[in-house]
């Protein structure tokens, strides 16, 4: 019996060592990303956000607000400022802000009016409140320009990442209501209609043309590739979609990825663009505190996988050496709700 016990102990120790070796091998095979981006949109400051601790666990290099940071819907500047201040009191967000760089853009509800565009009366004042919340210095050029668009450059030992943040509100032309179907809006072929406005378009072209980054992420608060649902989307301005695709292609910029929000759903869209050597991905992540839980389907010819209608946030792991991006729709407690890998 004594000999049997010695044999059993030996087997257990051998198995433990073998398992340890296997785990080490698996861990070694898992590549550590060179740069981690976390982003999300549609956040009500008065509602619980379960994700701030999870986001920190991902150890992101940057957090990008995709718009609707707060739900203000007001032309009262003091009220707008007070609602932003409420978000600043959220403990989990404060911890994130103290540990991770935070950048981003606005959408309609933090801009100040649902589905709002260029005709919003206090857009200039709203811009300053937004920049205050984002802690943009008073002497920044962004304080004197029209619109909240900006670019941010990051460098790691393996390479460079550029994040281009667009403003799809300040200059956007009027939407056309669709009275002939159950959709809210319909596309316009008016060549003067715009999403970005002349100055921002020129700026975007310069940013992409002059970029030597290994990955170029474009944050658009509204979806770019999903354009059939009839809500807000670049698809309501098809000539602008064509212009964006041509701008990306002609620039020669590497690894262009589109991020978007707004819709209270999360999904991956992917399209082959003529002249572009890699597929264009639009990663929609929305929303953080509330979602389209009654979602029952909508067309999107570019969709990859399924729509996630649960609350979620987005993670992009960038591997510069392998020229690969891993996109993950994340739920609470580190749950991966859906993922997509793309080579560039």
For each feature predicted by the language model, list its residue ranges:
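Sec-dependent signal peptide recognition
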Residues: 2-9
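Metal-dependent phosphoester/phosphodiester hydrolase catalytic core
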Residues: 18-344
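C-terminal motif of bacterial Sec signal peptides marking the signal peptidase cleavage site
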Residues: 14-16
């Amino acid at each position: 019996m004594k000999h049997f016990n010695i044999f059993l102990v030996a087997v257990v120790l051998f198995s433990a060592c073998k398992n340890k070796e296997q785990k080490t091998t698996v861990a070694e095979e898992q590549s550590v990303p060179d740069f981690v981006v976390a982003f999300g949109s549609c956040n009500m400051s008065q509602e619980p956000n379960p994700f701030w601790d999870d986001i920190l666990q991902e150890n992101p290099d940057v957090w990008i607000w995709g718009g609707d940071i707060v739900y203000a819907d007001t032309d009262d500047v003091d009220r707008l400022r007070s609602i932003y201040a409420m978000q600043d009191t959220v403990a989990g967000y404060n911890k994130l802000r103290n540990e991770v760089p935070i950048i981003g853009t606005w959408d309609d509800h933090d801009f100040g009016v649902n589905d709002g565009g260029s005709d919003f009366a206090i857009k200039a004042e709203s811009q300053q409140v937004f920049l205050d919340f984002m802690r943009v210095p008073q002497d920044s050029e962004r304080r004197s320009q029209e619109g909240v668009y900006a670019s941010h450059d990051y460098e790691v030992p393996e390479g460079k990442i550029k994040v281009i943040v667009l403003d799809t509100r300040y200059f956007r032309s009027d939407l056309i209501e669709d009275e002939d179907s159950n959709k809210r809006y319909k596309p316009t072929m008016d060549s003067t209609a715009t999403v970005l406005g002349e100055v921002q378009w020129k700026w975007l072209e310069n940013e992409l043309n002059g970029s030597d980054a290994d990955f170029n992420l474009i944050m658009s608060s509204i979806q770019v590739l999903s354009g059939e649902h009839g809500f807000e989307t670049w698809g309501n301005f098809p000539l602008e979609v064509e212009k964006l695709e041509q701008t990306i292609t002609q620039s020669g910029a590497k690894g262009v990825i589109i991020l978007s929000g707004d819709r209270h759903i999360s999904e991956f869209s992917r399209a082959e663009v003529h002249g572009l050597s890699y597929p264009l991905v639009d990663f929609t992540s929305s929303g953080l505190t509330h979602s389209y839980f009654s979602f029952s389907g909508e067309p999107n010819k570019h969709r990859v996988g399924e729509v996630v209608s649960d609350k979620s946030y987005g993670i992009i792991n960038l591997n510069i050496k392998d020229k690969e991006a891993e996109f993950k729709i994340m739920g609470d407690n580190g749950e991966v709700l859906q993922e997509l890998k793309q080579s560039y």
